[in-house]
């Protein structure tokens, strides 16, 4: 630094000093990580299509993180894919969300879609399908169009002959590519936060979240 040059020049006046500034390499960008949480063995989740889209995306600086909630451990032997099996603590689940960048869901139907909702309240970009309950909770430009398809066999509460969503695979790949190419790592989900917040839930139970209530001891609280 110029400071060091001045100090050394005073200390060693017969020498000439030159400043060559320190080179600090630019930190490499961390990999863009897609992630999914759920029972990936359930045909309704269409997890195989998420894997296919990830492979076809074919970007070396991407990762796919999977929290599998299945009856048995699952292995996915593909490069850049990590599977976490078994039950994990709330802390570890929060760390999983922290590690990842974009939540990917491709279900034919969801009552809610808790993985996607939990990602949304953390303001992650979220990809969901436009069938089932998830679009009620999450407003995202990455909402995949769905047709309808008839079930060929029973699937838990869904019976053969019923219909559920037939999500557009090309749109899934398009949204994943857009999120990666534009480095989308944040998305404001105000709608989700309001809908799932304490005040909103209290109102749905007919309670006024701002009024004073009494606890079991008879003491007044607010």
Regions found by a protein language model. Name each.
Residues 1-6, 13-26:
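Donor nucleotide-sugar binding/catalytic pocket of nucleotide-sugar-dependent glycosyltransferases
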Residues 29-90, 98-99, 166:
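Conserved catalytic-core segment of nucleotide-activated headgroup transferases in glycan assembly
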Residues 94, 117-121, 132-136:
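Short alpha-helical segment that forms part of, or immediately flanks, the ligand-binding pocket
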Residues 103-104, 127:
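A short hydrophobic beta-strand element within the catalytic core of glycosyltransferases
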Residues 108:
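Aromatic "clamp/platform" in nucleotide-sugar-dependent glycosyltransferases that forms part
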Residues 125-128, 138, 142-145:
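Short hydrophobic beta-strand element within catalytic cores of glycosyltransferases
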Residues 163-171, 180-209:
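A charged, aromatic-enriched C-terminal amphipathic alpha-helix characteristic of glycosyltransferases
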């Amino acid at each position: 630094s110029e400071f060091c040059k001045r100090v050394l020049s005073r200390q060693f006046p017969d020498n000439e000093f030159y400043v060559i500034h320190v080179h600090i390499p630019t930190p490499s960008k961390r990999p863009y990580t897609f992630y999914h949480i759920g029972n990936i063995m359930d045909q309704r989740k269409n997890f195989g299509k998420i894997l296919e889209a990830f492979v076809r995306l074919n970007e070396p600086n991407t990762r796919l993180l999977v929290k599998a909630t299945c009856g048995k451990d699952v292995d996915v032997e593909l490069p850049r894919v990590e599977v976490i099996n078994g039950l994990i603590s709330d802390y570890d689940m929060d760390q999983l969300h922290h590690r990842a960048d974009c939540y990917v869901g491709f279900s034919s139907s969801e009552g809610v879609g808790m993985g996607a909702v939990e990602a949304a309240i953390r303001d992650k970009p979220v990809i969901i399908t436009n069938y089932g309950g998830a679009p009620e909770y999450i407003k995202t430009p990455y909402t995949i169009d769905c047709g309808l398809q008839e079930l060929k066999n029973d699937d838990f509460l869904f019976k053969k002959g019923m219909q559920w969503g037939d999500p557009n695979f090309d749109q899934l790949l398009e949204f994943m590519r857009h999120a990666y190419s534009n480095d989308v790592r944040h998305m404001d989900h105000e709608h989700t936060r309001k809908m799932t917040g304490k005040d909103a839930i209290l109102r749905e139970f007919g309670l006024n979240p701002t009024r004073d209530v009494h606890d079991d001891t008879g003491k007044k609280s607010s």
